[in-house]
Design a protein with these regions (language model features):
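Short solvent-exposed beta->alpha transition segments
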Residues: 9, 24-70
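N-terminal cap/lid segment of alpha/beta-hydrolase-fold proteins
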Residues: 108-146
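Cap/lid segment of the alpha/beta-hydrolase catalytic domain
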Residues: 154-210, 387-398
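Alpha/beta-hydrolase active-site loop
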Residues: 204-225
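Accessory cap/linker subdomain of secreted extracellular hydrolases
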Residues: 251, 257-339
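Short beta-strand/loop motif that positions the catalytic acidic residue
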Residues: 340, 346-348
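Conserved alpha/beta-hydrolase "acid-adjacent" motif
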Residues: 353-360
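Catalytic active-site module of serine/aspartate enzymes centered on a nucleophile-bearing elbow/loop
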Residues: 382-386, 390-420
Length: 420
């Protein structure tokens, strides 16, 4: 078929091809970084999982395009099915190439504040985090009233927005509103890899580039707020953000302490293989088996002695450049945290399959459990995003509206400002 470069036309074509089961043709539209992270097989699994719930496609709606940002246009295409619907969300560049593709709930599922958020108890304002061409937008949430509140900077994993939007859920917005309701000022921001996605696959890019400059800038922005105690600004990281948090604190001595939510410690290539195998076991079949085998091959290359700065990013896990993986080899989050003279709160979900008690938390415990200023707690019913549930955790669970467990918000708030 003739390739159109108009983002809306591209989005419609992709939905039509997907609905027709022509997944290999959709993969041909993927940018190298997307192709490294997904495949025709993974698209087939995701699509068939959704259609099993919603029934066959009955109609494809009009694409809705957002204003261009960092050279990409985000397009949402509503799809009506026999027993419901879904939204196909894509990021398209000006040549018609796909840089992002996900299946989301119908757009009519708005985020609702959790019961523990009390909007009349805080204010919010927009900020710019960082300077120069890689500056990003953010939000600072400050409790009302007179006080020198503790502050908390939130760090997400992956190319996330400031709310860590996942389906209809916004776990970082849950945290910001819930904590601000309890007397904690919070700064959150769009990741540089979200606003400037081209950075994530650029040669030379590392975890330091992904996290440290903007995290340090956010810490200093919070310290400048007149209602915030500059000596009590902490950093919270979830998943990869939890892994990176000790590195941020090492770079910025004024950080008062760390909160790690499901911070991973197992070498990431091995974790990626574990997750791929878990997903293949949840939904056995040729496509999931092929996806797990592909991840295993990429992980083996990442961990091999043959990995070099010139190894193409498209051959590596997540489409990250070799520089990222070579830098990770020299970074030990537990040892870095242990060298910090700062208090820490480590929380882990018992149902988390992405970061686990057995493979990840055990390393934090071995390195830090004997320290009196370190608190470690497992929320047995929580998944990776700290949503409560029962039974095995699955990616599909993130597409149902949920909120961060109120017990997690209480743990963090009480640790930052112990009840008197």
């Amino acid at each position: 078929m003739t390739r159109d470069t108009d983002p809306a036309a591209v989005a419609l074509a992709v939905v039509d091809l997907t609905a027709a089961g022509r997944f290999a043709e959709v993969e041909a539209w993927f940018a190298p970084r997307l192709r490294a992270a997904a495949s025709a097989g993974t698209l087939r699994v995701g699509w068939e999982t959704e259609i099993a719930k919603t029934g066959p496609v009955r109609a494809v709606g009009t694409p809705v395009s957002e204003p261009p940002a960092a050279g990409l246009v985000r397009v949402r295409v509503p799809v009506t099915c026999e027993r419901g619907g879904l939204t196909v969300v894509m990021s398209v560049d000006d040549t018609g190439v796909l840089h992002g593709l996900r299946l989301a709930p119908p757009s009519g599922t708005p985020w609702e504040p959790p019961a523990y958020a009390e909007p009349d108890r805080f204010t919010e304002h927009e900020v710019t985090v960082g300077a120069g061409p890689l500056a990003v937008p953010g939000t600072i949430t400050v409790p009302r009233g007179r006080g020198r509140w503790p502050g908390l900077v939130l760090l997400a994993s992956g190319p996330a927005d400031r709310d860590l939007t996942t389906g209809p859920n916004k776990p970082f917005k849950d945290l910001a509103w819930g904590l601000a309701s309890r007397g904690v000022a919070v700064a959150r921001f769009d990741k540089v890899t979200h606003v400037h996605p081209e950075t994530g696959s650029a040669p030379g890019f590392t975890m330091v580039d992904e996290y440290v400059p903007h995290a340090v800038a956010a810490v200093r922005l919070l310290q400048e707020q007149r209602q915030v105690d500059p000596a009590r600004v902490f950093v919270l990281g979830l998943s990869g953000g939890g892994k990176a948090a000790p590195r941020v604190a090492a770079a910025e001595p004024s950080v008062a302490g760390l909160v790690s939510l499901a911070g991973d410690t197992l070498p990431l290539p091995r974790a990626a293989v574990r997750v791929a195998r878990y997903l293949a076991e949840l939904d056995p079949g040729p496509a999931t088996t092929a996806a797990a085998e592909s991840v295993a091959r990429q992980a083996a290359l990442v961990e091999s002695a043959g990995l070099a700065p010139t190894t193409p990013a498209a051959d590596l896990l997540f489409g990250w450049p070799a520089s990222y993986w070579l830098d990770l080899r020299d970074y030990d989050p537990v040892a870095t945290a242990a060298a910090l003279d700062k208090p820490m709160l480590l929380l882990q979900g018992g149902r988390d399959y992405q970061v686990t008690v057995a493979d990840d938390l055990v390393r934090w415990q071995a390195g830090l459990a004997q320290r009196p200023d370190v608190t470690i707690r497992v929320h047995e019913a929580a998944d990776h995003l700290f949503f409560r549930g029962e039974g095995p955790s699955t990616p599909a669970a993130y597409e149902a509206p949920q909120h961060v467990d109120p017990a997690v918000v209480t743990d963090i708030a009480d640790w930052l400002s112990p009840p008197r």
